[in-house]
Amino acid sequence: LESANQDLDLQLGSLANAGGRILHTGNGTFGLDSGQVIRAGGELTTNGLLDIRASEWTNSSVLQAGRLNLDIGTFRQTAEGKLLAVQSFTGRGGDWSNDGLLASDGSLRLELSGGYRGNGRATSLGDFALNAASLDLGNAASLAGGANVTLGAGNLLVNRGRITAAGDLVASAASLNNYGTLGGGGNLRLNAPALLNERGLL
């Protein structure tokens, strides 16, 4: 299914897109019920705005939007899942687990009341900000920003993977345990009353 209209509004009883592709080349709003988006499967691409709100969601599909806004209580992304944004990626919610890819060609910002964990990648070409109650990055995980990166963990930040910034990197946590890589092309600032760097690289 392909549409070049400025806005695309789909009012459907249900949508099955497994193995299929929906392409919206307009720059307006992609109108589809959040419940149908997260159950549809397949690939969904829009050059416009895509808003997804749900209490919980497990994603193993590929979704791309010009501007992607997520408000997900409990979010889990498998290794096959990809959420991509061209201009901006904004995410809010509770507990998030990412084993896939979260990416933006512009800015990426996540504000979580719970934890962020997993072995997946989160990357932006612009500024990157992630604030959560806790951060737990696995051995294969990476957080990368093409400009400045700001991380905040209300409690514990555990890094076994790679956290990098082309610009400044600022990480703040009540306790920071680094077993991986923390690096910035500009300034590196770690704000943590308790800091452990065991076989890690700063």
Where are these regions (language model features)?
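Short, T/G/N/S-enriched strand-turn elements that build extracellular solenoid repeat scaffolds
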Residues: 1-3, 17-24, 39-45, 57-64, ...
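Surface-exposed loop/turn motifs in large extracellular/passenger domains
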Residues: 3-11, 25-34, 46-53, 66-71, ...
